[in-house]
UniProtKB/Swiss-Prot annotation:
Name of this protein: Methionine--tRNA ligase
Chief location category: cytoplasm
InterPro entries from the UniProt entry: aa-tRNA-synth_I_CS, Anticodon_Met, Met-tRNA-synth_bsu_C, Met-tRNA_ligase_1, Met-tRNA_synth, Methionyl/Leucyl_tRNA_Synth, MetRS_core, MetRS_Zn
Entry keyword set: Aminoacyl-tRNA synthetase, ATP-binding, Cytoplasm, Ligase, Metal-binding, Nucleotide-binding, Protein biosynthesis, RNA-binding, tRNA-binding, Zinc
Species of the source: Leptospira borgpetersenii serovar Hardjo-bovis (strain JB197)
């Protein structure tokens, strides 16, 4: 972490949500990750701004508006409001949330293009494209379907086959058709405009600029944190950087390219420029007397520009975007932080499986601060995917947030404090020792000791939020032990002033923990501040013994947050599923199987159900439905199981999952090996769901 006391100037962005769909938990993950970092920077006194916008251009937006019989402008205005409402409901606090369909964005996009053209970074050439004569438009690859030329799978997109993975030219599709009207497309030539990306790679013959992308990536710290990112970038450099098609033919919703007829900027040119436009609109409105405010970030490398993105848009942000900026007189980003995807209950987000969770539905039934807390506990600095396991979510929030960090506040803020006229006393030597543990306790970090405060600050800076949460939770445990050891509910009867000392120490400790927690759960931290009769938002400069509260009045206690209600999760998941798949009337299936056969308790007792933990999972070659798992059953050892669950679970997501196992099943010889047990599951097809034990079950535990 930069330990300098000089205030840093930081401009932060998160990726732009596309205006053709609802906000889902993937968007929320990135928004929360970015917001935590921004709140931390502001809380330690840096000048930091957070910008985003709706990504509004492209064929899908144009066609969606046409389908609704409204203009694209009407569509993006409505969707933009919906997106902003959904994202901010999770406490994501933008300094400005804009739209890429703005005058500022058009002006900056035009300026960048003309400067690139002037410096020889733009070329034009004719290309072949699919054209629908009925709709009178050139078709993007995703608006063409047909039979794969490689494996003959039907209903595949124009650029790649989802069955065999082959990539191809749209004209190679068999029996191709326009997805809008079903008409077979024809091939037409069209002049397209290209950005000569190879000019910014010195290993290519045409390179003629000072800025070299590969050198920038290898020598700067912009994208150096993840081995996965560096490996992927090396692959792209080794393959050679190709010219990038930055134009689209009309009809197209976007900005027209200067001096070109019926040509529009491809959405990926003006989308990242939206970061700049959002900041420009904000600075002009809020700093009217500082006309150079925009340039002080986008042209001055003494400031910092930090992008948070998902790993699926790495190519655009690490290659095209910095080259466009440097080639047009602006500066390249300081940092590009890349995160992974979010899964739900061990699966990828999927509409068909009901795991594609919309932000609006989640926030309707569950506390958004709880999700912030949970995601922070899972997020590290790399681009690993994370999983939202709702069982783990319940346990983590109820135990670590409510049962630990909030519990220490509520235990001393109700009846005990009422008896003490809701007034703090002074902090005893023992209480001061507790506060020093929270503020300055030395902790071993590698070969040296560092204070707990610096460790937490450094972890925030490095986006290692999981480490932040571990340290804060550990401190919360310490405060609760202090409460237990001193039992103020007993002291209040024998020695009220001693009880007042205990309460004073605990509430000061809670105040300091609220400061540490503020970037993660701002509302909860502000509620603790309100309880303590403190004005404003928590700031890290108050993490000091000189800020201890003594002999002050404390406000009446109000509920800070509730435990997670598991019923609310079930209702949320069901409503989310129904919104994606409206319930259809089902025709009852006839069945020859006997149902409702009764068995005796003696027969049931023969079945040995135990908790197992999957320690290994892999697909079975030649078996589409099977997954080969090894299950740890505690004292019974590890058993080999072939389970027909592949339609619902990807093997790579199963490791570490606790399941219910029929442990005493007679081993069964199968074509692929011996299966020694059975995993319990319910449902069919993609709705199949493994039974997962509740709470802290251990491998080998027997079900009763």
């Amino acid at each position: 972490m930069n330990s300098s006391s000089i205030q840093r100037k930081i401009l932060v962005t998160s990726a732009l949500p596309y205006a053709n769909g609802p906000i889902h938990l993937g968007h929320v993950l990135e928004g929360i990750q970015t917001d935590i970092w921004v709140r931390f920077q502001k809380a330690i006194g840096n000048e930091c701004y957070f910008f985003c916008a709706d990504d509004t251009h492209g064929t899908p937006v144009m066609l969606a508006a046409r389908k609704e019989k409204i203009t694209p402008e009407q569509l993006i205005e409505r969707v933009g409001q919906e997106h902003y409402t959904d994202l901010t409901s999770f406490g994501i606090n933008y300094d400005n949330y804009d739209s890429t369909h703005s005058k500022a964005n058009q002006e900056i996009s035009k300026d960048i293009y003309l400067k690139l053209k002037e410096k020889g970074h733009i070329s034009k050439r004719s290309i072949e494209q699919a054209y629908c004569e009925k709709d009178r438009m050139f078709l993007p690859d995703r608006f063409i379907k047909g039979t794969c030329p490689n494996c003959n799978s039907k209903n595949q997109y124009g650029d790649n086959c989802e069955v065999c993975g082959a990539t191809y030219n749209p004209k190679d599709l068999i029996d191709s058709h326009c997805t809008l009207c079903g008409t077979p497309p024809v091939v037409k030539n069209s002049d397209h405009i290209f950005f000569k990306l190879g000019n910014f790679h010195k290993k290519t013959e045409q390179s003629n600029v000072d800025f070299d992308l590969q050198s920038w990536i290898e020598t700067s710290e912009a994208v150096s944190e993840s081995e996965g990112v560096k490996k992927k970038l090396k692959e792209w450099f080794d393959a050679g950087l190709q010219d990038w098609d930055i134009s689209r033919d009309g009809p197209y919703f976007g900005f027209e390219i200067p001096s070109e007829k019926n040509k529009y900027f491809y959405v990926w040119l003006d989308a990242p420029v939206g970061y700049m436009a959002s900041s420009k609109n904000f600075f002009e409105k809020n700093f009217p007397n500082e006309p150079n405010k925009f340039d002080s970030f986008w042209k001055d490398k003494n400031s910092e520009i930090v992008h948070f993105i998902g790993k699926d848009i790495l190519y655009f942000h690490t290659l095209f975007w910095p080259a466009m900026l440097e080639g047009s007189g602006y500066r390249s980003p300081s940092k590009i932080h890349v995160h992974g995807f979010i899964g739900v209950n061990g699966e990828k987000m999927s509409k068909s499986r009901g795991t594609f969770i919309k932000a609006k539905t989640f926030a309707k039934f569950l506390d958004a601060e709880h999700l912030r807390f949970y995601l922070a506990a899972k997020l590290g600095p790399g681009m690993d995917d994370i999983d939202l396991s709702f069982d783990d979510f319940v346990n983590k929030v109820n135990a670590d947030l409510v049962g630990n960090l909030i519990n220490s506040v509520s235990r001393v803020s109700t009846t005990i404090l009422d008896t003490l006229d809701r007034t703090l006393g002074t902090v005893s030597e023992e209480g001061l020792a507790l506060l020093e543990e929270i503020l300055t306790q030395p902790v071993k970090t590698g070969t040296r000791d560092d204070s707990i405060q610096n460790i937490i600050k450094t972890a925030y800076e490095q986006r290692n939020y999981a480490k932040v949460m571990r340290e804060i939770t550990r401190l919360g445990d310490r405060v609760n032990r202090y409460v237990n050891d001193n039992a103020p509910w007993k002291l209040i009867k024998e020695n009220p002033e001693k009880a007042r000392e205990i309460v004073t120490a605990v509430l000061n400790a809670s105040r300091f923990l609220a400061i540490y927690l503020y970037p993660v759960v701002p509302k909860i931290s502000e509620q603790i501040y309100k309880l303590l009769n403190l004005k404003g938002s928590p700031e890290f400069k108050d993490l000091d013994k000189s800020r201890i509260l003594e002999k002050t009045k404390i406000n009446p206690y109000e509920m800070i947050t509730k435990r997670v209600d598991e019923k609310a999760i079930k209702v949320m998941l069901e409503e989310n599923k129904q919104s994606e798949h409206p319930k259809k009337e089902e025709i009852p299936k006839s069945s020859n199987k006997e149902e409702g056969i009764e068995i005796s308790i003696e027969e049931l007792s023969k079945v040995e159900l135990r908790v197992g933990e999957i320690v290994e999972a892999k697909p079975v070659e030649g078996a589409d439905k099977l997954v080969n798992v090894k299950v740890d059953l505690g004292e019974l050892g590890i058993k080999n199981v072939f389970a027909g669950i592949k339609i619902a679970y990807q093997p790579e997501n199963l490791k570490g999952l606790k399941v219910v196992v029929v442990a005493n099943l007679k081993p069964r010889k199968m074509k692929f090996g011996i299966s020694e047990a059975m995993l319990l599951a319910s449902g069919e097809g993609e709705s199949l769901s493994l039974f997962v034990p509740h709470k802290d079950a251990k491998p080998g535990d027997r079900l009763k």
